[in-house]
From Swiss-Prot:
Gene3D superfamilies: 2.40.50.1070, Nucleic acid-binding proteins, Vaccinia Virus protein VP39. Keywords: 4Fe-4S, Iron, Iron-sulfur, Metal-binding, Methyltransferase, rRNA processing, S-adenosyl-L-methionine, Transferase. Residues 15-73 form the TRAM domain. This is 23S rRNA (uracil(1939)-C(5))-methyltransferase RlmD. It is an enzyme of class 2 (transferase).
Length: 449
């Protein structure tokens, strides 16, 4: 569902507490980049302070077991503190960790992942590996909110402030791919001249393999002069332009269907389809999944929550046959289209609610040697028991939520699988987002019927 900026939107605020200053020493970072300290036996989370740094902080929230505080003054500085590259850092809510060296960010996220997996599964785990790309200029997709400021008679374009619905009017965004960052000022200029400038919702920027594109969400039908202005902008900047008058409609005003590359394959996608934000990490993630599954020419493989085929089609290049299962009809159709585009005839896509029992489906009858799943944040609770009944030799679980990965892992471990590899995917450097993948092996001698 589309979301729009509203200056009158109610913001929930924490109950004010009496101002209280503390001096604390941070010992670690949590997965979200907050410094973790102890004071009088209680954990204190404080933004902007790194491990080893001592700081004067002010409490903003005081609970029975923990407190939150804001930084007042740094008393010592860590050698792992670096200068943020973004001029909007600390105000913009997009990034939280640009002040921390990238190796510190990655080690903190990896440690948090392993603590969670160990605590929840009770298993003896191998050291986690790291999959990462460049810390800047990585983001190939972004949504910028738009709001016309009547008092100043100017268009604001940017991201939300931290813990606020207010907009930060950005002039630069160094985590964006350079092709997208270069569009910020000319795009702002173009949109500011539209007759519909007061009735714009947001703009999405996407860097496809065949060039950048934008999706403009507008609240009223556009005047022909506005459409022509956008066509002129598209031609001048080499950009494809799509118009979105509502949450469901999409019209190409100028340009070609976007594509991206993965494992040497070309995949077409709709501008609103999900694709991984970080291309470099996606390439490595797919390669790691293929290696962990140890795909053989005789293998029959199942890909659950397959989307448009990001893993499915590279698997089909190597296996005897692959079945992709997805709950979104449009993505199933796009997966089939991409299979035809890449001349892959050994892959079949099915639309299926993965909360249902898929073990009775005809395409399950032959069984599967290996399974890959890449669910959304809610995880795959509804399908884990079905995976154990299929008893594949290998399972690769790709996760955007370590909590649900840990929960679902327990089902596999209880069924006789062994967790042999874990990787932390730094898909979103400088943010608190943590993604991961895990490999489970099953003793074929104990496979269930």
């Amino acid at each position: 569902m589309a979301q729009f900026y509203s200056p009158n939107r109610r913001v929930t605020t924490r109950k004010a507490i009496p101002a209280k200053n503390l001096t604390v020493t941070v010992t670690s970072l949590d997965p979200f980049g907050q410094g973790v300290a102890r004071h009088e036996g209680k954990t204190v989370f404080v933004t902007g302070v790194l491990p080893g740094e001592q700081a004067e902080v002010q409490l903003t929230e005081d609970k029975r077991q923990f407190s939150h505080a804001k930084l007042k003054r740094l008393l010592t500085h860590s050698p792992q503190r670096v200068e943020p590259q973004c001029p909007h850092f600390t105000r913009c809510g997009g990034c939280q960790q640009q002040h921390a060296d990238i190796t510190l960010q990655q080690s903190s996220k990896t440690a948090a992942l392993m603590r969670l997996m160990t605590r929840e599964t009770g298993a003896e785990l191998p050291d986690a590996s790291l999959i990462a790309g460049t810390p800047y200029a990585y983001r190939r997709r972004a949504r910028l909110a738009l709001y016309f400021q009547a008092k100043e008679q100017r268009l604001l374009m940017g991201y939300r402030q931290s813990n606020s619905h207010d907009l930060v009017d950005i002039k630069a965004c160094p985590v964006l791919r350079p092709e997208l960052e270069a569009l910020l000022q000319p795009l702002r200029d173009c949109l500011s001249r539209l007759k519909a400038v007061k009735r714009l919702g947001h703009v999405e920027l996407v860097q496809a393999e065949n060039g950048p594109l934008l999706v403009l969400r507008h609240l009223d039908p556009l005047h022909p002069a506005d459409e022509q202005a956008l066509r002129d902008f598209a031609e001048q900047q080499g950009v494809s332009v799509y118009l979105a008058p509502d949450a469901d409609s999409l019209t190409c005003l100028h340009g070609d269907e976007p594509v991206y590359l993965v494992a040497g394959l070309t995949l077409a996608f709709s501008p609103r389809d999900f694709i991984q934000v970080n291309d470099a990490v996606n390439q490595q993630m797919v390669a790691q999944a293929l290696a962990w599954l140890d795909v053989q020419p005789q293998d029959r493989i199942l890909d659950l929550f397959c989307g448009m085929g990001n893993f499915t089609l590279p698997l089909a290049q190597r296996a005897a046959s692959v079945v992709g299962v997805e709950g979104v009809t449009a993505l199933v159709e796009k997966g089939r289209e991409n299979a035809r585009r890449n001349a892959l005839s050994n892959v079949t896509f099915f639309h299926q609610n993965l909360e249902d029992d898929v073990t009775q489906q005809p395409w399950v009858a032959q069984g599967f040697d290996k399974i890959l799943l890449d669910p959304a944040r809610a995880g795959a609770a509804g399908v884990m028991e079905q995976i154990t009944r299929l008893a594949p030799k290998r399972v690769v679980y790709v996760s955007c939520n370590a909590t649900t990965l840990a929960r679902d892992s327990k089902v596999l471990l209880a069924a006789g699988f062994t967790l042999v590899n874990v990787a932390m995917l730094d898909m979103f450097p400088h943010t608190g987002h943590l993604e991961s993948m895990a490999l489970f092996l099953h003793d074929t001698g104990t496979r269930k019927a």
